Swiss-Prot record:
It holds the Pfam family Ribosomal_L3. HAMAP family: Ribosomal_uL3_B (MF_01325_B). Keywords: Ribonucleoprotein, Ribosomal protein, RNA-binding, rRNA-binding. It comes from Borreliella burgdorferi (strain ATCC 35210 / DSM 4680 / CIP 102532 / B31) (Borrelia burgdorferi). The lineage of its organism: Bacteria, Pseudomonadati, Spirochaetota, Spirochaetia, Spirochaetales. Belongs to the universal ribosomal protein uL3 family. InterPro entries: Ribosomal_uL3, Ribosomal_uL3_bac/org-type, Ribosomal_uL3_CS, Transl_B-barrel_sf. This is Large ribosomal subunit protein uL3.
């Protein structure tokens, strides 16, 4: 599966030739290198291991340094992904943004913006209680269990708690523009995460 690790720069808009305004997200790519391979004999499946963004030397352990010994001039990477079904690359090769030239749609995976501790109405879209007429609860989630049987609250019951900050994938985003010189990709619509967060862009599955 064709893919790259990139950074979400932000959103803007561009005009198409027919005058229609299209909202786009700008994704910038630092050099992506193949840092290893997985084989059927050793690992049970074949895949390429790609990495991007140099890791600080203070955060590099000896085992990680050993993994990069055979790679000349490539520093240990902060973000690492597996790419299955991608051929024609060897360890040390760079995957450039022009690999998306023939791709019309991509899937983008990122970490959503964390919202902190939120109530049930915001977190799960509950309706809440009556707003007046003597009601003693307005934004409460209501009952969380049953009666004597089962005499407990089931796991996974929707309640207040930490919201968002999860991995999310947006599928079938249209590729609007590829800028090879600036190593940038413009996709139609929004992608998960805050400005400056790192995302994984892959060729669309559908």
């Amino acid at each position: 599966m064709l893919g790259l690790i990139g950074k979400k720069v932000g959103m803007t808009q561009i005009f198409q030739k027919n005058g229609i305004v299209v909202p786009v997200t700008v994704i910038e790519f630092q050099p992506n290198y193949i840092i290893g391979k997985k084989t059927v004999d050793r690992d049970g499946y074949s895949a390429l291991i790609a990495g991007s963004v140099d890791l600080k030397s203070s955060k590099v352990s000896k085992p990680i340094k050993g993994q990069y010994k055979s790679l000349k001039d490539i520093e240990p990477k902060r973000y690492v992904i597996e790419l299955k079904g991608l051929d024609g690359y060897d360890a040390g090769d760079e995957i450039k943004v022009d690999v998306f030239k023939s791709v019309k749609y991509v899937d983008v995976t990122g970490t959503t913006k964390g919202k902190g501790f939120q109530g049930a109405m915001k977190r799960h879209n509950f309706s809440g209680g009556p707003s007046s007429h003597g009601s003693k609860f307005h934004r409460h989630l209501g009952g969380t269990g049953q009666a004597t049987t089962p005499a407990r609250t089931f796991k996974g019951t929707k309640m207040a708690g930490r919201m968002a900050g999860n991995q999310q994938t947006i599928q079938n985003l249209e590729v609007v523009l590829i800028d090879e010189e600036k190593r940038a990709l413009l996709v139609k619509g929004a992608v998960p995460g805050a400005k400056g967060s790192f995302v994984v862009v892959k060729k669309s599955k559908k």
